[in-house]
Amino acid sequence: MQKRELGKSGGNSGGSSGPPAKRGRPFGSTSANSAAAAAAAAAADAMSPSALLGPSLLVHNSFVEQNNRRIVLALQSGLKSEVTWALNTLTLLSFKEKEDIRRDVMPLAKIAGLLDALLLIIDDWRDIALPKDLTRGTRVRTLGTNASVTGFGNEYDALASIQPPGSGIGSSAAEALGKKSTGKHQSSQWWMEEDGLFNLDDEGRSEKQMCAIAASNVIRNFSFMPDNEVVMAQHRHCLETVFQCIHDHMTEDEELVTNSLETIVNLAHLMDLRIFSSLKQSYININEKKAVQAVVGILNSSVKAWNCAAAELLGRLIINPDNEPFISPLIPQIHKRLIDLLSIQAVDAQAAAVGALYNLVEVNMDCRLKLASERWAVDRLLKVIKTPHPVPEVCRKAAMILENLVSEPQNRGLLLAYENAFAELLFQEGKYSDSFARILYELTARSNSRVASARGIWGM
C-alpha cells in the first residue's frame, strides 16, 4: 500500500504527464525503463486516431502501400502460414464502419493482382469441393482388424486368441500352406483398401474451405467501400465466381453463399449482365441467363435472409435497361415468389418484396400487366398498408405499386373489384390519401372506364 501511494504522489507531483503507451509489440527489451517510457509516449503522440486504420489497431495507413506486393505474393504462394497472414491482414484492413474516420490511401480492390489472388483461393476450394450430400463423415479405420498383429493396439488380444500349431485335429500341411498364402494375400491388400491412410485429405480440404470463406469475406468487405465498387462491378472473374457460388447454393457452404450474395447486392446498381458475353477473359462458364436463374433459384430457397437479399438484388438489376431482356422471361416466376414473401409475417421479407415489386413495375410495362393478374397480389399489398408496416416508406411504395397498376387501361377492370377498399384507405390513411385519390380517379373518372365500372359494381 505504501508503494502504491508513493507512486500516485510521485505521478501527481510531476505535473502533467504524457498519455499512457498503447498496447502492442515491445519497443525493445534491452533498453532502460526511462527510454522505453519515452519511446512509448512518442509513439502514442505520433499515432493519432486519424492516422490509425481502426479504433484499436496499431496499423498505420502506409502499411498497405508498403506491403501490398507482399500481401499479393503471400496469397499466391499457397503456403498455409503466408495465406493465413495475408487473409487476416486483409480482413482487418477491409473492415470499415460507416462512420469510420480513416481514409485508405489506395482502394484495396485496385491493388494489382489482389482481387485475382483472392478469387484464386475460392476457385481452388471449388475445384476440390464436394457437395454436402456426398461429403464423407468420420471413418473408422479397419486396417488389419482380422490380422494377429495390426499396429492399431490390438496385438495382445489378437495374439492371445491364436491357437498353437498342431492343436487342431486332422489338419494337413496343404491346408496350413493354403491359409498362410491367403494371409499373405490379404495383408498385401490392406494398403489398397485404406485410401487416404498416409495423407490428410479431409484436413487439407477443411483448411481450403476456411481460406475460401475468409477470402469471400474480404471480397464482401471490399464491396462495401464505394471506391472499390466500379472496379469490382467490371471484373468478370469476380462476378463469375460470386454468381457461381449463388448458383450452387444447395450444395455450397452457407457462409460462402451468404458472402457472395451480399457482394453481388452491393454491386448490383453498377452491374451490366452483358459482361458475361463480352470479350473479357472468362474463367467460369456462365452467361446472362444462368446468372438470372441463379438469383431466382436462391429467391425460392428456404432461407429467409437469402430470399430478402435475392429480392433486393433483382430490384437493383432491373433498374439498368440493359438487364431487362434477361430478367423479363422469368417475370411470372419472380412475381409469384415475391407475392409469397408478402404473406410472411416478417417485416424484412415484406420490405424486400415491396421494394423489388416497386422497381419492377416502375420500369417495365409487362410487369405491371402480369402483376395485376396475379392472385393475391393486390390483397397482400393492401394488407401491408392496412396493418400497417412499421416502416412508412414500405407502405408508400405499396401504394405507389397500386397506382402504377391502375395506370394501365388493361388492369382497370381487375382493380375495380377493390374500389371499396381503395375508398376506405382514402379516408383512413391520411399519409397515402393522395395515391388512393389518384387510383380512384383513374378507375372511375376516365371516359373509357364506364363499362368497366358497371362490371365492377354489378358483376357483369
UniProtKB/Swiss-Prot annotation:
Disruption phenotype: Developmental and morphological defects at the vegetative stage in cotyledons and true leaves, and during the reproductive phase in flowers and siliques. Increased abortive frequency of embryos. One of its GO terms (biological process) is regulation of endosperm development. Expressed in roots, leaves, stems and flowers. One of its GO terms (cellular component) is SWI/SNF complex. Residues 8-17 have a biased composition (Gly residues). ARM repeats lie at residues 227-269, 323-362, 366-407. SUPFAM superfamilies: ARM repeat (SSF48371). Keywords: Developmental protein, Growth regulation, Nucleus, Repeat. The keyword Nucleotide-binding does not apply. Its main location: nucleus. Transmembrane segments: none annotated. Pfam families: BAF250_C (PF12031). Interacts with AS2. Involved in leaf and flower development. Plays roles in leaf development partly by associating with AS2 and repressing KNAT1/BP transcription. Required for the formation of anther cell layers and normal expression of genes that regulates anther development. This is Armadillo repeat-containing protein LFR.
